[in-house]
Amino acid sequence: MSKSGKKLTQKLKKNLPVTGPQAPTLYELMQWYCLNTNTHGCRRIVVSKGRLRRWIWISLTLCAVAVIFWQCALLLMSYYSVSASITVTFQKLVYPAVTICNLNPYSYSKVKDRLAALEKETSQTLKNIYGFTEPLIRSKRDVGVNVENSTEDIFLKQIPLYRLESVKGSQLVVSDLKTKKRTRMSAKVIHRDAESVQDPGNMVGFKLCDPKNSSDCTIFTFSSGVNAIQEWYRLHYTNILAKISMEDKIAMGYKADELIVTCFFDGLSCDARNFTLFHHPLYGNCYTFNSAERGNLLVSSMGGAEYGLKVVLYIDEDEYNPYLSTAAGAKILVHDQDEYPFIEYLGTELETATETSIGMQLTESAKLSDPYSDCTMDGRDVSVENLYNKKYTLQICLNSCFQREMVRSCGCAHYDQPLPNGAKYCNYEEYPSWIYCYFKVYKQFVQEELGCQSACRESCSFKEWTLTRSLAKWPSLNSEEWMLRVLSWELGEKLNKNLTKNDLANLNIFYQDLNSRSISESPTYNIVTLLSNFGGQLGLWMSCSMICVLEIIEVFFIDSFWVVLRQRWRNWWENRKENQAEDTPEIPVPTMTGHDNPLCVDNPICLGEEDPPTFNSALQLPQSQDSHVPRTPPPKYNTLRIQSAFQLETIDSDEDVERL
């Protein structure tokens, strides 16, 4: 192609309208897209004749787009949902761990010396309130207990007990249970077992104050004096146990051969050696059957009562602490070998003189983690440190979080839960305000102000045993005499009395059958199904494919962005040129003659104003390097050409341009 043909082609392309992604405006870009897209609704908006028909197609297209967004939102929500499936299998099942505790944590004969002063003040308080006198059987049992003859009530001084006379807001009228002296005080009132005060005259409570601020006091009230005395006793009891070493507490508790009288499992005899010691802070020495610490786990070969665990427990009700344990019997918990036995929350109680049969049904559950649920697989992604060194559970996390806040707020750890590293258990001598601080932290924990409930998450996998309990009178009237005689003879070396049926409890715990249920979750949609449903919705409502979606993304986002950017850049550049043209001042060119001419500086040929230059001297003047000698411009040949022929003829293609 000749040089003139190329110039003509460039000129024609410059004058032709620009379409497609290089369109100068958004309107032209959208018009080009609607004419060239495979989405029929958008094309009908442009090619339709008449305003009414065009608005109809606009409405239909917008409705189709809205339906697509609605259906896709439903698909996304369904993608994060799960469906549960239940599978029932029949196989030999591993027998779970069974933890057994006596409701009385320590033998009274072994712990009475440490609790003598506390029990003396408790008995005196009951006498002051209700005229209570100690039973004769207790008086005989307490013979030999060394109690210091002190007129000062240590425990009542630390936590005074009051009877409420009247309550008006924070103004109280109370009477001291020891001195009967009525006083008026201002304190907050917290009702432990009632929402409101019905009859203040029948309510008993104790007062707790912050040692650092004597005006910050709270009275905890109870609807019954029994509950008030028990709560008051437990606070002092916990304070005493916190100062006793673990070795001494184990020695004060029941031994395995004392608690377990007879044992059978799967038709075979067993004894105390098949149980593992587990010391619980509230129930003392507990014993776990089929613990993971013993190595190989036992398996149930058959279902039914004859193939489970059968034990007879010695309760020893005469050694019970009357203010701590108001019920007689035992407590058991069925749990996995890797789990911590929270027997105080989930345990099942056994009655004395009763045979308790418990049938078990195993259910294993497995949930999906993020993004389907907020559960955790092993607790490693939870910010709360596990203080129990056992498999993660929600209860372990909550207790560990509470203990951490207890140490942070009160400076010491509560006795009911494991001890964190570097912390000590709370007691009056080292931490005088720990009880008041404990109630404040516990209130915040219950009201979910500590953040424990939000930080702790449920475990994704767990085992659960559904228990079916039945009771029967044991031993029967005809077998009671010989059975108690035989058991008394077998335990004669350990006991110095004849057994009664109220000293024993019979437990039979077994699998009802060997069917185990497995509940597992699976995603309702996978990624393939989700994309297929997306494609179906797009094809149904907009007759477009994934390529059309990519085209929409390119035109409506990428190309539109560059069109707007080019428009703003062009406007900015034009405004900048106009501002520069307006701000440029006209600089007058001064006339330089004679010595004012810079070419004459240090030039002896330059003459002064009084000496006009001659022709020869003018030729000797130096010339400027940047100066150009003006020449005659060439003629403008373009004015001689005839351009009307190009304006009348339409050029259809580049070949015509090259031909011209």
Swiss-Prot record:
Residues 1-55, 559-660 are cytoplasmic. InterPro entries: ENaC, ENaC_chordates, ENaC_CS. It is a multi-pass membrane protein. Keywords: Cell membrane, Disulfide bond, Ion channel, Ion transport, Membrane, Sodium, Sodium channel, Sodium transport, Transmembrane, Transmembrane helix, Transport. GO terms for cellular component: apical plasma membrane; plasma membrane; sodium channel complex. PROSITE patterns: ASC. It catalyses: Na(+)(in) = Na(+)(out). GO terms for molecular function: ligand-gated sodium channel activity. The keyword Ubl conjugation does not apply. Its main location: membrane. GO terms for biological process: multicellular organismal-level water homeostasis; sodium ion homeostasis; sodium ion transmembrane transport. It is found in: Apical cell membrane. Originally identified and characterized by its inhibition by the diuretic drug amiloride. The chain crosses the membrane at residues 56-76, 538-558. Residues 77-537 are extracellular. Disulfide bonds join C101-C286, C209-C217, C263-C270, C375-C460, C397-C456, C401-C452, C410-C437, C412-C426. Gene3D superfamilies: Acid-sensing ion channels like domains, YojJ-like. This is one of the three pore-forming subunits of the heterotrimeric epithelial sodium channel (ENaC), a critical regulator of sodium balance and fluid homeostasis. ENaC operates in epithelial tissues, where it mediates the electrodiffusion of sodium ions from extracellular fluid through the apical membrane of cells, with water following osmotically. Belongs to the amiloride-sensitive sodium channel (TC 1.A.6) family. SCNN1G subfamily. Component of the heterotrimeric epithelial sodium channel (ENaC) composed of an alpha/SCNN1A, a beta/SCNN1B and a gamma/SCNN1G subunit. This is Epithelial sodium channel subunit gamma. It comes from Xenopus laevis. The lineage of its organism: Eukaryota, Metazoa, Chordata, Craniata, Vertebrata. The gene is scnn1g-a.
